[in-house]
Amino acid sequence: MYSFADVDNSLKQHRLIKKINISTFGFSRGAALARAFTNQFMWQCESDCNGLSYGTGKYPIEFKFMGIFDTVASFGLPATSLNNNLTFDGRDMVIDERIKMCVHHVAGNELRFAFPVDLIHKGNGQIANPNWKELVYPGMHSDVGGGYTPGSQNVN
């Protein structure tokens, strides 16, 4: 696992870098981690009139795309009070408006209470950036993420 200092040291070795483009992807809790990682990375950047820059080399950086599938930010055992220190606070799940494009695929028929989805729209139902899309698909959480094998589900 790299720290931000490791990333900065690696960048110093490549003096021909003109711009850093970042895209993140994830399903379920991985989508929550993609959102949190992107925010943590953005908080390490400096912002000016030209956009974002990163590291001691002030490399221009752009967060191009976030592809997330049915974000679930709950960690640990459902319906327990165990504190596992793996919960996110509200700002970790907020998608920064400087992300150029975001697509979030969401399960429309999830019934399990342990899989609450964290939508990308604000509380008022509006999406912050017109280049972002939240698409609802029929099925449950693992239908969206591809976890069920064909023919493994039955109606009874």
Q: Where are the regions that the model predicts?
A:
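Core alpha/beta nucleotide-donor-binding catalytic domains of modification enzymes
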Residues: 1-3
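Glycine-rich nucleophile elbow surrounding the catalytic serine of serine-hydrolase chemistry
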Residues: 26-36
